[in-house]
Amino acid sequence: MPSMDESTLSASSRADLAELGQRLYDEALVRREDELITDPRGQPIGWLLDTRVPMLDGELFEEVGAVLAERLQNRGGHQVVGYGFGAYPLVCSVLSTDDDRFKGGLVREERKEHGRRRLVEGPLDEDAPVVLLDDIINSGRSASQALRLLRRDGWEVEGLLTLFNFTWSSGQERIRAEGLWTDSLLDLNLKDGRSSGSDSA
């Protein structure tokens, strides 16, 4: 079940975040009983979280954007980037809030070879740091790949903010070892051993 870091939240905020997290989890959860799902090697797995489903729902999109924006404001971050289809809706949700200080960027897998030939699309200030957004931090491989691409392109990445942290994995530690702060709205304490899986971070 999802849980959250309660140290800086009021009782009402904790309840609101728990309720939002449960809705995100319930709508994102896909089980093998419902459809065939596989890991990157093509082997069947028991479940995964497809956060694109709830994040492309208008109501949850706005609610999550408001929560992410508040976390970013508390850390002084106003430039956000996303790498991959799980992250792109998060970037857009932050930009949909009333705070017009936010700027967003979408990170490509490789620099575009024509046109403006950019790795990162969006109106970002290249001299200011960015915060990487992602839906899930699991092993940290996806976030590490995004970090390498961004650093190679000259960007300073100061932190990683995700919806879910899979607490049984070491992804957050892996990213912190790169000198970034990490934060997740919710810790996922569920473990399903061999049948666990996610196509994200």
Question: Where do the language-model regions lie?
Answer:
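A generic structural signal for well-ordered alpha-helical segments
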Residues: L72, L95-D99, L150, I175-R176
